[in-house]
Amino acid sequence: MYDIVDLVASDPRCLSENDYCTNQTLFYTGDMMKITYINHSGFLIETKDCYYIFDYYRGELPHLDKEKEVIVFCSHFHEDHFNPQIFEILDDMGMTYQAVLANDIRKRNHLSDRKITYVYHDQTYNLDNGTEVDTLLSNDSGVAFIVKTKEGTIYHAGDLNDWYWDGEPKADNQRLTSAYRAEIRKIKGMHFDAAFVPLDPRQGDHYADGILYFIKNVDSNVIFPMHYWNDASVIKRFITEYPQYKSRIKNTECTKGEEL
């Protein structure tokens, strides 16, 4: 198991109310993968030869080594998970890149002159750099990603979550829960070096339903809560209410030097 070490973090109170925390926390998984939280559900993972960017929405990227290729993953078309500006940013940085996009993005965006693999759920894709990508069906939109690299295996949920909403019909909530659990059962017992899972405060008392089911069924060295809409208090709430999982949960918006 890799050691996960907080490297750099800044106080989220320094951010404007219109910004998500940008590049403010770095994590190392040993000497193999460096993980940078960009914003919302967006993360940058650096390996020896490649960068992986997941669900870029907004925010600046750190300096990137032009000798490394970038692979851009977008789980679905929602604007808080897919922003085509990421390609302009990478062009301006002089980076070589390719993209792995959920098929629902192709229907709504015309992206020409890009190296793109459009993906469907429950499929396996082998990229030309040796990365293997498996997909799950999101119970909201698009897919979730399982990305297997030489350095480790990554899970990014996109919008696959136990979306229980107060005030919605009971049957709808039950359907979403059943669909979520069916997908997670497909990866039951699988090992991930890093997992990125929604923890959405808008769900009220059901905010942790999805991440709890994931933790109890899937083995991951470390789990990064995401999709919390700039309300980092939900991470501390989870750690407080479920201290038994504290060692596996990374607070992407913790202050410098805070031990979790």
Model features per residue range: what roles?
Residues Y2-Y51, E241:
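Zn-dependent metallo-beta-lactamase
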Residues M33-H40, N109-Y125, S141, Y207-L260:
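Binuclear metal-ion centers of metallo-dependent hydrolases, dominated by the metallo-beta-lactamase
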Residues G59-P62, H78-F82, I105-N109, S141-V143, ...:
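Active-site environment of divalent metal-dependent phosphoester hydrolases
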